[in-house]
Amino acid sequence: MTPTLRRKLEALAERREELERLLAEPDVVADNTRFRDLSREFAQLEPIATALADETRAKADLAAAEGMRADPDLRELADEEIAAAQARLQELEQELALLLVPRDPRDDGNLFLEVRAGTGGDEAAIFAGDLFRMYARYAERQGWKVEIESDNPGEHGGYKEVVARVVGRGAFSRLKFESGTHRVQRVPATESQGRIHTSAATVAIIPEADEVDDIVINPADLRVDTFRSSGAGGQHVNKTESAIRITHVPTGVVVECQTERSQHANRDKAMKRLKAQLLDAERQRQDAAQAESRRLQVGSGDRSQRIRTYNFPQGRITDHRVEGLTLYDLPNILAGDLDPLLQRLSHEHQVDALAQLSAG
């Protein structure tokens, strides 16, 4: 471990001790908000304290085993214990390094999933539908809830565009690396010559704005249009202009919702999406500025970036952001078994973040 990382660990250990003292003070206990915030910070630092204590014990075990080597009768046993202690120390060093990676405060939150057909006409819309079902099935496996906010079905299946809210603990942390352009290579059902076509769809993963997020939307900046819904609700919604489209004039961001029966409910949902979109745009602007001075291989969230290819004839899926990340398990992945991909992407992100910490 580099001296820089070791100093960061020591500073966090000192902060945990300070928090322990603060949480015992009567004035802090009496202040519910402060007590809650400090308790949350203390809980986040607890794994580091536990790993540091384990490291101290492993170092003591190593020293004791090295001391045993002076006795010829115990040398063989000592060598075994030395090897075990060294292996344990190596594991703990890796664990501590990963614990230093800053946690994204949005990781536990919900998200908006947006899938749009790109180049490829009807085939692109069908592929967009495949991607949406893949994420919906993955969400179902995690016990999350998927609520379709708006959709525009393709003429021959799939979606020209579909927007859904994904509700579940840890949803954003799992899916946040999915933003970008997804490419498919396959023979369309309408292709009589058996030729492989290439189509694309874009995916956007936008964290839902927290209620405490500091963003003020001036009502004067909004243009609100109503229209007849073509979504859920049967004939009732088609008789009234219950659907809402909101345009944020300064940025040109447009959101709409037509899934609820009442105009008021649709407006509330649309405003939540607008807030999330504006916050996400600001985050991406800040990330772009920071990326000028540091490398971000995974997780930039750039929706123009081609991130993955789905090759149906070969049953292959290749993620272009991680060298060597190719899996020949396309049917299962499309059925919602995304963890083999997502875990590799998360690990790569941690490695990148750790490299930045070491450099700093």
Curated annotation (Swiss-Prot):
UniProt keywords, alphabetically: Cytoplasm, Methylation, Protein biosynthesis
Modification note: Methylated by PrmC. Methylation increases the termination efficiency of RF1.
PROSITE patterns, per database record: RF_PROK_I
Annotated Pfam families: PCRF, RF-1
Modified residues (N5-methylglutamine): 235
Region Disordered, residue ranges: 281-310
Entries under InterPro entries matching the protein: PCRF, Pep_chain_release_fac_I, Pep_chain_release_fac_I_sf, Prokaryotic/Mito_RF, RF-1
SUPFAM superfamilies for this protein: Release factor
Cellular compartments per GO CC: cytoplasm
UniProt GO molecular function: translation release factor activity, codon specific
Location of this chain's protein in the cell: Cytoplasm
Superkingdom classification of source: Bacteria
Listed HAMAP family: Rel_fac_1
Protein function: Peptide chain release factor 1 directs the termination of translation in response to the peptide chain termination codons UAG and UAA.
Family of this protein: Belongs to the prokaryotic/mitochondrial release factor family.
Xref: NCBIfam families: prfA, PRK00591.1
Stated name of the protein: Peptide chain release factor 1
